[in-house]
Amino acid sequence: MILIDGKSLSKDLKERLVTQVQEYKHHTAITPKLVAIIVGNDPASKTYVDSKEKACAQVGIDSQVITLPEHTTESELLELIDQLNNDSSVHAILVQLPLPAHINKNNVIYSIKPEKDVDGFHPTNVGRLQLRDKKCLESCTPKGIMTMLREYGIKTEGAYAVVVGASNVVGKPVSQLLLNAKATVTTCHRFTTDLKSHTTKADILIVAVGKPNFITADMVKEGAVVIDVGINHVDGKIVGDVDFAAVKDKVAAITPVPGGVGPMTITELLYNTFQCAQELNR
C-alpha cells in the first residue's frame, strides 16, 4: 500500500514554487499578491486564512487579510471587492466562506473578477473548466487531488473513477477534472441508490461527504486508489470520510487524514495566485 502523503508533496511543490516566484519577480519586478477577506469572527475562518497567509510568506507571495465586522452589509462588501478588482497591485481575491446569513454568497462570488478568482468559483471559471480552457482557475481542492494523482504516477486515462459527493466545491469540479483527464466518471450523491455497487467497481475512489468513516472496507475494490477529502472531528481527533484503518490494507494507495488532501488545497491556492499574477500581466 502506498500512502499518498499530501504534507510531504505539498512541501516539495512549495519549494518548486519558491524558485518560480523568485524568477518571475526578478524578470518582471512584480510580486504576486493575494487579498483574503473575512466577514465576522468565525474562529475556523480565521485559522484557515492565517494558514494561507503563512503559506504565502513561505513562497514569496504578498498577502493581505481584510477583516470586516459581522454587520457589514452586502453592498459594502461588494464595493470593497470592486476596489480590489480595479487595483492592479492585487492579483488574487479570496472571500472566506461561510459568510453571515444576510449576505448572498453567490452575489459575492460573481462580483470577483474571473481573472482574480483564486478559488475558481466564478461561473466563468466553472465554464472554462468544462471547456478545458487553459486560462481556467481550477478550484484548489480538486486541483490538489489531480496533482496528487499525477505526482504519484496514478493513471487516470481509461480508469473508472467514482466520486462520492456532488458539491460545487469538490465533487462536481473533481468529476470534471477526471473526465478531462480521460477517466470514465460516476458521480454519486445522497440520492444514489446502492452506493456500494458503484464504489466497489472504482479504480479511483474520491470521497467528499463530511461523514466520519463513511466508506468501509467492503465498499472498496481490492487494489483501488482512495482519496479521502473528509475532515471530521470525532472524540478530539480528526478523521476522514473513509475508515482508514480498515481500508488501507485492501487498497493500492490511499490518502491519510490529516496530512492528505488538506495541505494540497493551500498549496494549490498559492499556485493559483501565481497563475493570476502571470495572466494579468501578460
Curated annotation (Swiss-Prot):
The keyword NADP applies. Catalyzes the oxidation of 5,10-methylenetetrahydrofolate to 5,10-methenyltetrahydrofolate and then the hydrolysis of 5,10-methenyltetrahydrofolate to 10-formyltetrahydrofolate. GO terms for cellular component: cytosol. This is Bifunctional protein FolD. Homodimer. Pathway: One-carbon metabolism; tetrahydrofolate interconversion. Keywords: Amino-acid biosynthesis, Histidine biosynthesis, Hydrolase, Methionine biosynthesis, Multifunctional enzyme, NADP, One-carbon metabolism, Oxidoreductase, Purine biosynthesis. It holds the Pfam family THF_DHG_CYH. The gene is folD. PANTHER family: C-1-TETRAHYDROFOLATE SYNTHASE, CYTOPLASMIC (PTHR48099:SF5), C-1-TETRAHYDROFOLATE SYNTHASE, CYTOPLASMIC-RELATED (PTHR48099). Belongs to the tetrahydrofolate dehydrogenase/cyclohydrolase family. It comes from the Bacteria. Its EC number is 1.5.1.5, 3.5.4.9. NADP(+) binds at residues 165-167, 231. CDD domains: NAD_bind_m-THF_DH_Cyclohyd. HAMAP family: THF_DHG_CYH. Transmembrane segments: none annotated. Gene3D superfamilies: Leucine Dehydrogenase, chain A, domain 1 (3.40.50.10860), NAD(P)-binding Rossmann-like Domain (3.40.50.720). GO terms for biological process: L-histidine biosynthetic process; methionine biosynthetic process; purine nucleotide biosynthetic process; tetrahydrofolate interconversion. It comes from Francisella tularensis subsp. mediasiatica (strain FSC147). SUPFAM superfamilies: Aminoacid dehydrogenase-like, N-terminal domain, NAD(P)-binding Rossmann-fold domains. GO terms for molecular function: methenyltetrahydrofolate cyclohydrolase activity; methylenetetrahydrofolate dehydrogenase (NADP+) activity. It catalyses: (6R)-5,10-methylene-5,6,7,8-tetrahydrofolate + NADP(+) = (6R)-5,10-methenyltetrahydrofolate + NADPH; (6R)-5,10-methenyltetrahydrofolate + H2O = (6R)-10-formyltetrahydrofolate + H(+). InterPro entries: Aminoacid_DH-like_N_sf, NAD(P)-bd_dom_sf, THF_DH/CycHdrlase, THF_DH/CycHdrlase_cat_dom, THF_DH/CycHdrlase_CS, THF_DH/CycHdrlase_NAD-bd_dom.
